[in-house]
C-alpha cells in the first residue's frame, strides 16, 4: 500500500490522480491533500478519501473549509488536520507516512514542497514544470544526493521515460517531443496581433488550466518541456527536438545512434502517465481507450515555425545560457499571460514582455530555493511594470 500526498488536488492533474486512486483503493491511500481555494471540490475529496491532513492557500480559505466541513455534517472526530500557507504545504510531504508525492501545484508555489520531498528521498510524480524550469540544477542535484525518484507525469516526458527504459542511455542520440501546435497552428502571422483570449483558450486536444493553455498557444509550454527534458534526462538543448503532431497520439520519440526510433503512443488521457508514475516499474490496467490499429488513421509530423512562435526559440536560448535565465523566463511569461487573459495586452506582447524582462534582469546562479524565489519575485515585478506600460500605451526606456 502506497501512501500519497497530492499537491494541487483540485486541479486537473490532482483530480485525475484521485480518480486513479479511486479505481485502485487496494494499492493507494491518500495521506494529505493540498489545494488552493476550491472549497467545494476539496470538501468532496475529504469526504471521499479521508486524508489525515488538508492544506489550503490562506487562513481565510481555511475558515471557509471549516464551515464547509461543518455544513457537510462530517463529525469533528473524522476531520483531517487543517492547515494553511507555505509551511503547511511542506508539512504535507514531510510526514514519514508519505512515500509518494504528486506535485501538481501550478507555478513556483509548488517548488518548496517538491524540493522538500526530493530531499527526503521520496518518489515524486512531477506534473509541475516550473519546478525544473526555475530550479532544475538545484532539484536534480538533490535527486542525486538523496536518492529520490523523480518520475514525470506530463505526457511527453512520461513517454520519453518509457522509451528510455528500452535501451542504453549512452546510445541515445536525440529526444523528440511532440506538440499539437495549439489553436493557432494554421493561423496566418498577420492575424496573431488580433487573436482574443477566448480563441487562445480553445486548445484542440487537452482541457487544462488557463495559463498552460495560453502557453500551448504560444508554444511556450513546449519550450518549458524542452528545458524540463534537459534536466530530467541529462540532454543538451541541441539534442532535444520538437515536432508538430496535430493528432497528439505520439507523445515522445527516442532516436538511437543506429537510427532506430522508439515512440510512446497512447490515447490522450492524463490518467495513463499519472498511473505510470504511481506504479513504476510495474504497470496496471488503465480505464482509458486503447488504440484500434485496424482503424484507418493519418499521423502528421511538421517542423515548428520559430519565427511565428518565438518563445519556443527563446526557451532553447535560455537553457543554453544557464544561470537564472529559465527562472526569469517562467516568471515573466506567467505575468504576461495573466495580462493577456485580462485583455490588457495583445497576444504578441507576451513574447515582447518576456524578452524585455530577460534583457533587463541580471543573470546569476541561484544556490537555494530562497534564491530562486527571490529571482522569481524580482522578475515578476519587472514584467508587471512592463505589462502595465503596454496596457497604458506607453513605451519603456
From Swiss-Prot:
Residues binding Mn(2+), per UniProt: 154, 156, 225
Protein name: 1-deoxy-D-xylulose 5-phosphate reductoisomerase
Family: Belongs to the DXR family.
Cofactor: Mg(2+); Mn(2+)
Residues that, per the record, bind NADPH: 10-13, 36, 38, 128, 130, 209
Keywords, in A-Z order: Isoprene biosynthesis, Manganese, Metal-binding, NADP, Oxidoreductase
Pathway assigned to this chain's UniProt record: Isoprenoid biosynthesis; isopentenyl diphosphate biosynthesis via DXP pathway; isopentenyl diphosphate from 1-deoxy-D-xylulose 5-phosphate: step 1/6
Superkingdom, taxonomy of origin: Bacteria
Function comment: Catalyzes the NADPH-dependent rearrangement and reduction of 1-deoxy-D-xylulose-5-phosphate (DXP) to 2-C-methyl-D-erythritol 4-phosphate (MEP).
Chain residues that bind 1-deoxy-D-xylulose 5-phosphate: 129, 155-156, 180, 203, 221-222, 225
Any one Gene Ontology molecular-function term assigned to this protein's record: manganese ion binding
Catalysed reactions listed for this entry: 2-C-methyl-D-erythritol 4-phosphate + NADP(+) = 1-deoxy-D-xylulose 5-phosphate + NADPH + H(+)
Known EC number: 1.1.1.267
Pfam families for the chain: DXP_redisom_C (PF08436), DXP_reductoisom (PF02670), DXPR_C (PF13288)
InterPro entries reported in the protein's UniProt record: DXP_reductoisomerase (IPR003821), DXP_reductoisomerase_C (IPR013644), DXP_reductoisomerase_N (IPR013512), DXPR_C (IPR026877), DXPR_C_sf (IPR036169), NAD(P)-bd_dom_sf (IPR036291)
Species for this entry: Solibacter usitatus (strain Ellin6076)
One BP term from GO: isopentenyl diphosphate biosynthetic process, methylerythritol 4-phosphate pathway involved in terpenoid biosynthetic process
Oxidoreductase recorded as keyword: yes
Enzyme class: oxidoreductase
